[in-house]
């Protein structure tokens, strides 16, 4: 099927609207660019996205029994959120080698998995960046914790992350709001660990519990994507499944998408394309974009 051309060309295309897509859209839009965000799933209201109990429990039972969420149910967030925020495995199947099973948890809606993640925001340390070299499995990353520190700081301040600076090399300190108070159960655990093991209990590094209507700050819609939209320079297009990139030599010059509702294809050109479709989906798009891979 020949892809139709759009009526206007954005300055940048961001593929994916989750945690990374929201940040990319915000940075580009606030820099003055016209940004088009493409999301494979629907654009839900906060009420639709989060649902309510006991309806969410009924959905879990029905979707597991029907075989739609037999793998997705293993994600911890499946039991805390609306299960409809996880993909239907019958419509989105995947396979793995028998000796190497892999749980691929996916969310296809505006906001992506920023609607279902646990909200724990830890900085990677040099233990992670140099793990392969230390274990004799190859070279380490060409960057380290210090290189990313300024960007971690900007995000921690933007997202209003709570936590404490504990001085641990394997858990780099950040710029946090004061730690959230411990629950009675956590206080008891802290006392037992200190008394029996002589170890401190580290406060969680994450977000305050969201209550009330609207989007939580831990979600793309509650922070970064909201700021991108507020510029008036960001358009979010839902139900747009990106098939592949359009290439000019070794440079991307646009994308071809499929409308999941109609099956029609469309070509959109842009001088900048940012892939934020999650690790595996981003790799699929890249591999599908060139016969030579």
What are the roles of these predicted feature ranges?
Residues 18-19, 184, 280:
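Residue-level detector of alpha-helix initiation sites
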Residues 27-30, 34-59, 240, 245-246, ...:
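Glycine-rich loop(s) and the adjacent beta-strand/alpha-helix scaffold that form part
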Residues 11, 33-34, 198-200:
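Residues that mark the start of a beta-strand
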Residues 92-94, 98, 257-262:
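Short acidic, glycine-rich loop/turn motifs
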Residues 61-65, 71-87, 93-103, 108-109, ...:
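Conserved redox-cofactor binding core of oxidoreductases
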Residues 5-20, 36:
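Beta1/beta-strand and adjacent pyrophosphate-binding region of the FAD-binding site
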Residues 42-67, 107-118:
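Conserved N-terminal glycine-rich FAD pyrophosphate-binding loop of Rossmann-like flavoproteins
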């Amino acid at each position: 099927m020949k892809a139709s051309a759009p009526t206007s060309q954005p300055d940048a295309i961001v593929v994916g609207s989750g945690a990374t897509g929201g940040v990319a859209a915000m940075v580009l839009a606030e820099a003055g660019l016209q940004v088009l965000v493409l999301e494979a799933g629907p654009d839900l209201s906060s009420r639709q996205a989060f649902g309510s109990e006991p309806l969410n429990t009924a959905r879990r039972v029905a979707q597991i029994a029907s075989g739609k969420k037999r793998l997705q149910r293993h994600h911890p967030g499946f039991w805390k959120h609306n299960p409809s925020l996880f993909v239907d495995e019958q419509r989105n199947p995947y396979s793995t080698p028998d000796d190497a099973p892999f749980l691929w948890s996916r969310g296809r809606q505006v906001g992506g998995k920023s609607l279902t993640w646990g909200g724990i925001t830890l900085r990677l340390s040099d233990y992670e960046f140099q793990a392969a070299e230390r274990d004799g499995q190859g070279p380490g990353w060409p960057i380290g914790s210090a290189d990313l520190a300024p960007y971690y700081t900007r995000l921690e301040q933007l997202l209003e992350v709570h936590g404490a600076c504990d001085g641990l090399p394997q858990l780099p300190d950040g710029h946090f709001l004061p730690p959230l108070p411990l629950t009675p159960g956590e206080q008891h655990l802290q006392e037992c660990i200190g008394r029996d093991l002589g170890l401190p209990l580290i406060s969680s590094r994450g977000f305050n519990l969201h209550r009330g209507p609207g989007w939580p700050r831990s979600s793309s819609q509650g922070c970064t994507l909201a700021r991108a939209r507020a510029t008036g320079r960001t358009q979010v297009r839902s139900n747009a499944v990106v098939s592949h990139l359009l290439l000019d030599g070794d440079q991307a010059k646009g994308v071809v998408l499929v409308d999941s509702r109609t099956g029609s294809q469309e070509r959109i050109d842009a001088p900048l394309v940012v892939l934020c479709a999650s690790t595996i989906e981003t790799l699929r798009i890249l591999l599908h974009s060139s016969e030579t891979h």
